[in-house]
Amino acid sequence: MKKTILLASVCAALLQACAPVSSPGEGSSTMSTTASSSRSALSLPAYYWRLAAATDASGKAIPALQRGIEQPLRLSFSADGMNIRGGCNTQFGGYTYKDGGLRVATLASTMKACEPGLMKLDAEIGQRLKGDLRATLSGESTEPALELVAQDGSVLKFVGEPTPETLYGSAGETMFLEVAPKRADCSHPMIPRYQCLMVRERRYNDAGVQLPPQEDWHPLYQSIEGYDHRDGVRTVLRVKRYDWKNPPADAPSKVYVM
């Protein structure tokens, strides 16, 4: 009898030891970790940050900054510093971002004169984007959001738009393209009777003097992002050329962005 009881106890212990271990909320914990990993993958330099809302410490909209939502006003971050564009002048300065805190160094600015509304926009955003701010990155990589809380309690909310480097998956090469005054008929594989920009690369020496052309005019079978061609006007553009890592089937493998 004792042997039977002992054998049953051993079997029960073995079955318990071999059973899979689980804990309440195991599935939700995994989902939380996945979401957290997605958020931690977000980075300030990977996006242009467009102003979407601006409120003061009491939650009221800041009138002078509403112009920056319509314009829109945009932040960008790089190894060289932070840039603010969309007002009258470009403002720029150093920054550090760590553990949910954004520290902005004293901003410098270009010195254009504009209508009062844009000048006020520059002053208001510069007044808030200084010193230590509380920064919160949220959302997924496809729809990121940035919230900045200034020292006066103002809350600035931004939505992220991928930079070309993020969108195309390459660093990009800076080059100069000369664009001919007239478009020319070209054989586009997707668009009948298409007219291409005629371009050629231009180079400069260390003194900034333009060198003689090293190639003939040739058709560009795509647009240049950020460039609107004026018929009859020849121009030289400073562009970045990106290798598109995973382009759609009907898209070019290289992209030109001003």
Ranges and model annotations:
Residues L6-C11:
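Sec-dependent N-terminal signal peptides
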Residues C18-H229, K240-M258:
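Lipid interaction determinants
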Residues M1-T4:
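Positively charged n-region of N-terminal signal peptides that target proteins for export
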